[in-house]
Amino acid sequence: LTKCEIKGLDINKGKAPAQTVLRRCAPYLLEEIRRANPKVIISLTTAVTKELGFSTVSNTANRGEIHSNDFVSNVVITLHPKVTTMIRQNSSGQMWGTDFLEVIDRDFEKASRLARGALVVPKLADALERYSKHIKIARSISEVVTFTNILSNLPSTSVISFDLETTGLDPFSNSAKIITAQFGYRTAEGYIEALVIPLWHRENTWFHPHIAWEYIAKILLNPDIKKVGHNIKFDVLYTMCCTGVRIQGIVFDTMLILHNINSGLNKNYGLKRAVWDWIPHTGLGGYEDKLPKLTKLVNNNESEDEIDE
C-alpha cells in the first residue's frame, strides 16, 4: 500500500482532478511499482491505465484485456467495484449496476491465475505465428473442392464453425456481397483448422466465385453437417438474401451463451471480448488489430507453387 502526497494541490478544483493528481503522482507511483516488481497489476480506472502508461485503452471499452509494458508483463484491465453500486447510465449509454460484479470477479480471478503462474499469455506476435499455420486460403477451384471434401467427410459427431465476411451489415442493400466464407473444424490430432474461401474482391482473378459458391452451398444445405457460429443468425440472413440458400444443420450460436453469462451487460457479447474472457491462454487477444499481419503470415506459409496454381 502506497500513497502519493502532493502539497498545494486541491483535487476538488479544475477539470478532471483525478487525472491531474495521477499525472503529478505518476513518477512516484511508477518508481514504487518498479521497486515492488509485481507479477501482475490490476487497473481499475481509465485514468490509472492511461496516466501510468499501462495502455491507451479505456477500461470501459477494453475490460478483461491483458496488456504489458516495459516493466510489468501483465496488466489486467477491469472496472472499479464501485460501479456495482451505481445504478445509472454512463456516458457511453451503458448501464452500471450489480450485473458487473461477475465480470469484475472474473477479471480478478484471471489476475490471480497470472500471479500464480496458472495462466501464461503468449505474445500476440508469437500466437499469430503459431495459429497462422492452421489457416488455409483457397486459391483455385480445385482447392475449394478439396476444402469442401474435407468438411463433407468429417466424422458424424463433428461440428464445424461457419462465418462470413461481408461488404456491410445490411443484407437487404443492393450492394450487399459476401466477401469470404470461412469454416473451422477440429482435426483428429486435436488442432483447429480454418478453411477460407474468397468469393469477391476487386482484383480477384483466381476463380469464378459462382462456381466456388456451388460447392460451398452443398455444405451449407447438408443438415447432417452440424454447424455453429457466433451471431450465426446474421450469416443465415445474409446468405439467404444474397444467394437464396437457407443454411441447414445449425446446432448452436456461441453469442447466445454469452448473452446468458453476461446478461444485462451491453457490448460484452462480441468475439473480441470472448477471447480475453475465455481463452486468454491462446494469446490471440487483440487479434482484430493484427489481421493484415495474420494475412501476410498465412500467405507466407504457402509455397510459391501453391500460390501460382
Regions found by a protein language model. Give the residues of each.
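Acidic beta-strand-to-loop metal/phosphate-binding motif
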Residues: 37-45, 161, 224-232
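Active-site-proximal helix-loop-helix substrate-binding element of RNase H-like nuclease domains
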Residues: 73, 82-85, 91, 115-139, ...
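Short, basic/hydrophobic alpha-helical segments
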Residues: 25-29, 33-37, 146-153, 207-224
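A polyanion-binding, active-site-adjacent surface
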Residues: 1-118
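N-terminal accessory regions of nucleic-acid-interacting proteins
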Residues: 100, 104-164, 168, 209-212
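Short amphipathic alpha-helical segments
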Residues: 53-56, 173-174, 239-241
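Residue-level marker for buried hydrophobic side chains located in beta-strands
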Residues: 77, 160-162, 250
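A short alpha/beta connector and helix-capping loop motif
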Residues: 171-186
